[in-house]
């Protein structure tokens, strides 16, 4: 599996997006990813919305290919945000420092 960083741009109002993210459906979505029921898995997300950046949501994904991320998100989520995955390597700066 490869790592992909995605800076999603919101297509809907940030308040609407926040409501969706707090819904019970997101808990089920997270469980499905954790149990390997989806082709890709969101490992971490960073939410800048509470801090004034109301047009982006950032995620680190694990997937075999970038298309698996769109498949995992599904059409409903893709109406709410963009998905342009960028394959990345992780640098663990603590390991570099210990080096």
Indicate where each model-derived feature is located.
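Conserved short beta-strand edge segments in small beta-sheet-based binding/regulatory domains
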Residues: 79-92
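Short S/T/G/P-rich N-terminal loop/turn motif that feeds into the first structured element of a domain
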Residues: 1-56, 64-71, 89-99
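"Short basic amphipathic alpha-helical interaction patches in structured regions
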Residues: 72-76
